[in-house]
């Protein structure tokens, strides 16, 4: 679970978007909100002050401290049956910008397979919670054509790096060959 220290460090380093996994209760949603926002909405401390560094934020009209509450994005992930049961109340917590229908983990934690009618009903619960709270609804990029989904997870950074490396080095790939020189060369 993401804690106050992790959120504080991310924000102090300049993060503008905080994504918190496995939010199951209103209390957890309020805690995440409190750690993300300065008073009066939250209880974020000034911490080490890294985010207030003039080199990083000196050109922000009004300064970082006075403007960040209006610019930070807080996304809470609904991944379990408990989170699903509390989705409407979680989405209604002031300061929550969006809820994320965590497609894979909802399937993992509930036992329903993506595409099954019961699975789709779960996604509709998250959908309705976001729409009724007038916040954004997030999901995987594959859902970009679903109604009302407006922010997306494009995939893992590992997969993106692997694709990039494959494109860059693809012509060099020859996994069947044996090295002829060097420490991995086959010895006669």
Give, region by region, the residue ranges found by the protein language model.
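Alpha-helix-loop-beta-strand connector modules within alpha/beta enzyme cores
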Residues: 1, 34-44, 66-70, 115-138
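Conserved anion-binding
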Residues: 5, 13-94
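Non-catalytic positions within long, well-ordered alpha-helices that form the structural scaffold/packing
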Residues: 11-12, 91-92, 144-148
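Conserved, mostly hydrophobic/aromatic
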Residues: 18, 32, 90, 102, ...
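Hydrophobic faces of well-ordered beta-strands that scaffold small-molecule active sites
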Residues: 18-20, 74-79, 99-101, 137-140, ...
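C-terminal helical cap(s) of enzyme catalytic domains, especially alpha/beta-barrels
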Residues: 26-42, 112, 157-182
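Glycine-rich, proline-tolerant flexible connector loops at the mouths of alpha/beta enzymes
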Residues: 101-118
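C-terminal active-site rim and adjoining tail of enzyme catalytic domains
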Residues: 131, 138-170
């Amino acid at each position: 679970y993401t804690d106050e220290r992790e959120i504080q460090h991310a924000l102090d380093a300049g993060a503008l978007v905080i994504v918190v996994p496995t939010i199951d209760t209103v209390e957890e949603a309020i805690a995440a909100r409190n750690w993300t926002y300065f008073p009066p909405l939250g209880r974020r401390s000034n911490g080490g002050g890294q985010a207030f560094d003039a080199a990083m934020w000196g050109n922000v009209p009004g300064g970082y401290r006075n403007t960040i509450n209006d610019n930070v994005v807080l996304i809470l992930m609904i991944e379990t049956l408990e989170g699903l049961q509390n989705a409407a109340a979680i989405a209604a917590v002031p300061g929550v910008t969006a809820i994320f229908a965590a497609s894979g983990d909802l399937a993992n934690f509930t036992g329903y397979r993506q595409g099954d009618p019961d699975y789709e009903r779960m996604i509709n619960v998250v959908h309705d919670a976001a729409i009724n709270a007038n916040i954004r609804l997030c999901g995987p990029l594959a859902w970009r054509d679903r109604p009302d989904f407006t922010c997306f997870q494009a995939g893992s950074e590992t997969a993106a790096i692997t694709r990039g490396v494959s494109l860059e080095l693809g012509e060099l790939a020859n996994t069947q060959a044996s090295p002829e020189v060097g420490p991995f060369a086959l010895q006669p």
